[in-house]
Amino acid sequence: MKRDGDTLHTLPLTSTGYVRRDAKAALWPIRWKIESILPYQREYALLRAAFRGGDTHANRYKVGKILENVESYDETSAYPAQQRTRNFPITTFRWLSGEDLQMSNIIDYIRHGRAVVGRYVFSGLRLRNEREPVPYLSLSKTQSSSFVVDNGRLLSADLCTTALTEIDLAIVMRQYCADKIACEEAMIARKGPLPKQYLDVIDKYYQDKTMLKNGPDGETEDEA
């Protein structure tokens, strides 16, 4: 508290709070750019509906078995790497209407590098490969009827409505097939790198973490 000039009122509740504060401070000089693309209520509601966490699921064909001599690996600093190397929405989202909501046009927008967030309806949804180890769609993130699930993941459904980003849609199209796919609503934005001021904060935290790990009391990057 003394080092950062905090009081009980301003003290971040978690370690992430310090990172958020540094990011906000770095972006303060261009706050007008950030404020100009903030979503309105309708856009925010669709973004929240499309939000999902990490993709973790047990293979239903391996349940109850003890596997010997298995291996695993961890990708170091995966989230910062994505922020540093990928493009993200950098403009206000624009709603599509009319013919633009046809799936062929949605796919064209994605091919041209646009961020697309939409709500899709799948009729006769089913896995392309019935032995798919990690089905992507979670029942809790959809409105589905006459469905078959494995520990919360959809294997099939007569009707399934769900909100997806363009990244999610590509995964769903790769894993599932359907008799019919329709887009109820969708919005698009141009993608580009995150602001340099924000990326500089990411770089600093990564460098600090790496120095600590490689120090005399830390672990090396290979051990991380």
For the regions a protein language model found, what residue spans apply to each?
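Conserved acidic
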Residues: 1-224
